[in-house]
Amino acid sequence: MTLSNEWYNTELENSELETLHRSPTVEYSFYNAVRSGDMEAVIKNCSEDEFIRLEGTGVLSRNALTNIKYHFVVTTAMLTRYCIDGGLEPEQAYRLSDFYILKMDSCKTIRQVADLHHEMAKDFTGKMILQKKSSILSKPVMQCVDYIYSHIKERITIQVLADHTGLST
Protein backbone atom coordinates (compact mmCIF):
# COMPACT_ATOMS: atom_id res chain seq x y z
CA MET A 1 0.00 0.00 0.00
CA THR A 2 1.37 3.43 -0.89
CA LEU A 3 1.68 6.15 1.71
CA SER A 4 -0.99 8.10 -0.12
CA ASN A 5 -3.45 5.22 0.16
CA GLU A 6 -2.48 4.61 3.76
CA TRP A 7 -3.10 8.30 4.56
CA TYR A 8 -6.49 8.14 2.83
CA ASN A 9 -7.50 5.08 4.88
CA THR A 10 -6.35 6.76 8.10
CA GLU A 11 -8.38 9.85 7.24
CA LEU A 12 -11.49 7.75 6.63
CA GLU A 13 -10.99 5.96 9.94
CA ASN A 14 -10.48 9.23 11.84
CA SER A 15 -13.54 10.85 10.27
CA GLU A 16 -15.68 7.85 11.21
CA LEU A 17 -14.40 8.02 14.79
CA GLU A 18 -14.83 11.81 14.73
CA THR A 19 -11.25 12.20 15.96
CA LEU A 20 -10.55 15.92 16.07
CA HIS A 21 -7.62 17.99 17.26
CA ARG A 22 -8.35 20.62 19.86
CA SER A 23 -8.01 24.30 19.08
CA PRO A 24 -4.41 25.52 19.34
CA THR A 25 -5.55 28.53 21.41
CA VAL A 26 -4.46 26.99 24.74
CA GLU A 27 -1.04 26.10 23.33
CA TYR A 28 -0.59 29.58 21.86
CA SER A 29 -1.54 31.15 25.19
CA PHE A 30 1.13 29.07 26.92
CA TYR A 31 3.78 29.95 24.31
CA ASN A 32 2.87 33.63 24.59
CA ALA A 33 3.05 33.49 28.41
CA VAL A 34 6.59 32.13 28.15
CA ARG A 35 7.58 34.69 25.50
CA SER A 36 6.21 37.59 27.55
CA GLY A 37 7.90 36.38 30.75
CA ASP A 38 4.61 35.73 32.55
CA MET A 39 6.03 33.36 35.17
CA GLU A 40 2.76 33.27 37.12
CA ALA A 41 0.81 31.92 34.12
CA VAL A 42 3.56 29.42 33.29
CA ILE A 43 3.70 28.12 36.87
CA LYS A 44 -0.10 27.79 36.91
CA ASN A 45 -0.04 25.83 33.63
CA CYS A 46 2.70 23.55 34.94
CA SER A 47 1.07 23.00 38.34
CA GLU A 48 -2.10 21.90 36.55
CA ASP A 49 -0.05 19.45 34.43
CA GLU A 50 -1.56 20.79 31.21
CA PHE A 51 1.37 19.31 29.28
CA ILE A 52 0.34 15.72 29.95
CA ARG A 53 -3.35 16.29 29.20
CA LEU A 54 -3.14 15.01 25.66
CA GLU A 55 -6.82 14.79 24.72
CA GLY A 56 -7.14 16.30 21.25
CA THR A 57 -3.42 16.77 20.71
CA GLY A 58 -2.93 13.95 18.25
CA VAL A 59 -1.12 10.68 18.62
CA LEU A 60 2.52 10.90 17.55
CA SER A 61 3.38 7.41 18.80
CA ARG A 62 1.36 4.46 20.02
CA ASN A 63 3.83 4.11 22.90
CA ALA A 64 2.71 6.52 25.66
CA LEU A 65 6.24 7.48 26.77
CA THR A 66 7.46 8.01 23.21
CA ASN A 67 4.31 10.01 22.45
CA ILE A 68 4.90 12.43 25.35
CA LYS A 69 8.58 12.71 24.37
CA TYR A 70 7.59 13.72 20.84
CA HIS A 71 5.21 16.32 22.29
CA PHE A 72 8.08 17.57 24.47
CA VAL A 73 10.25 18.08 21.37
CA VAL A 74 7.43 19.94 19.59
CA THR A 75 6.82 22.18 22.62
CA THR A 76 10.52 22.89 23.04
CA ALA A 77 10.87 23.80 19.37
CA MET A 78 7.85 26.10 19.54
CA LEU A 79 9.03 27.81 22.74
CA THR A 80 12.47 28.29 21.20
CA ARG A 81 11.00 30.10 18.21
CA TYR A 82 8.52 32.12 20.27
CA CYS A 83 11.34 33.27 22.56
CA ILE A 84 13.60 34.17 19.63
CA ASP A 85 10.69 36.14 18.21
CA GLY A 86 10.37 37.80 21.64
CA GLY A 87 14.00 38.93 21.60
CA LEU A 88 15.99 36.05 23.09
CA GLU A 89 19.38 35.69 21.42
CA PRO A 90 18.91 32.90 18.83
CA GLU A 91 22.06 30.93 19.65
CA GLN A 92 21.21 30.94 23.35
CA ALA A 93 17.67 29.77 22.59
CA TYR A 94 18.83 26.95 20.31
CA ARG A 95 21.43 25.77 22.82
CA LEU A 96 18.84 25.77 25.59
CA SER A 97 16.51 23.78 23.33
CA ASP A 98 19.23 21.25 22.50
CA PHE A 99 20.11 20.93 26.19
CA TYR A 100 16.57 20.10 27.27
CA ILE A 101 15.87 17.74 24.37
CA LEU A 102 19.04 15.81 25.19
CA LYS A 103 18.03 15.70 28.88
CA MET A 104 14.57 14.45 27.88
CA ASP A 105 16.19 11.55 26.02
CA SER A 106 17.19 9.98 29.34
CA CYS A 107 13.72 10.26 30.92
CA LYS A 108 12.21 6.86 31.68
CA THR A 109 8.69 7.86 32.75
CA ILE A 110 5.97 10.24 31.65
CA ARG A 111 6.27 11.99 35.03
CA GLN A 112 9.99 12.62 34.44
CA VAL A 113 9.23 14.10 31.01
CA ALA A 114 6.48 16.29 32.49
CA ASP A 115 8.74 17.51 35.31
CA LEU A 116 11.50 18.31 32.82
CA HIS A 117 8.96 20.12 30.63
CA HIS A 118 8.00 22.30 33.59
CA GLU A 119 11.66 23.11 34.34
CA MET A 120 12.30 23.88 30.68
CA ALA A 121 9.27 26.17 30.42
CA LYS A 122 10.24 28.06 33.58
CA ASP A 123 13.84 28.32 32.36
CA PHE A 124 12.77 29.85 29.03
CA THR A 125 10.38 32.17 30.90
CA GLY A 126 13.15 33.26 33.26
CA LYS A 127 15.44 33.96 30.31
CA MET A 128 12.70 36.12 28.76
CA ILE A 129 12.32 38.07 32.01
CA LEU A 130 16.08 38.71 32.04
CA GLN A 131 16.03 39.59 28.34
CA LYS A 132 13.36 42.20 28.92
CA LYS A 133 15.39 43.71 31.77
CA SER A 134 18.47 43.82 29.56
CA SER A 135 16.57 45.46 26.72
CA ILE A 136 17.68 48.79 28.16
CA LEU A 137 21.16 48.01 26.82
CA SER A 138 22.32 49.90 23.77
CA LYS A 139 22.22 48.37 20.30
CA PRO A 140 26.05 48.03 20.08
CA VAL A 141 26.14 46.18 23.42
CA MET A 142 23.43 43.78 22.23
CA GLN A 143 25.30 43.29 18.92
CA CYS A 144 28.38 42.37 20.94
CA VAL A 145 26.42 39.91 23.08
CA ASP A 146 24.99 38.27 19.94
CA TYR A 147 28.46 38.10 18.38
CA ILE A 148 29.96 36.55 21.51
CA TYR A 149 27.24 33.86 21.65
CA SER A 150 27.79 33.06 17.97
CA HIS A 151 31.58 32.87 18.34
CA ILE A 152 31.81 31.51 21.86
CA LYS A 153 34.75 29.19 21.13
CA GLU A 154 36.80 31.76 19.28
CA ARG A 155 39.25 34.34 20.57
CA ILE A 156 37.38 37.65 20.70
CA THR A 157 39.11 40.98 21.16
CA ILE A 158 37.78 44.46 21.75
CA GLN A 159 38.91 45.31 18.22
CA VAL A 160 36.87 42.45 16.75
CA LEU A 161 33.78 43.68 18.61
CA ALA A 162 34.45 47.27 17.56
CA ASP A 163 34.72 46.18 13.93
CA HIS A 164 31.53 44.14 14.25
CA THR A 165 29.56 47.12 15.59
CA GLY A 166 31.23 49.71 13.39
CA LEU A 167 32.55 51.62 16.39
CA SER A 168 36.12 52.62 17.14
CA THR A 169 38.16 51.42 20.11
Task: Annotate the PLM regions.
Residues M1-K127:
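Hydrophobic, helix-rich cores of sensory/ligand-binding and other regulatory modules
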Residues I136-C144:
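N-terminal positioning helix adjacent to the helix-turn-helix/winged-helix DNA-binding module
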Residues P90-R95, I136, T157-V160:
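Short acidic alpha-helical/loop segments enriched in Asp/Glu that coordinate divalent cations
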Residues T80-C83, C144, L161:
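Generic hydrophobic/packing signal
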Residues Q131, S150-T169:
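Basic/polar phosphate-binding segments, predominantly the helix-turn-helix DNA-binding elements
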Residues V145-Y149:
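Helix-loop-beta hinge of the Bergerat
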Residues A64-T66, K132-L137, E154-I156:
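Conserved short strand/loop->alpha-helix "switch" segment adjacent to the catalytic nucleotide/phosphoryl-transfer site
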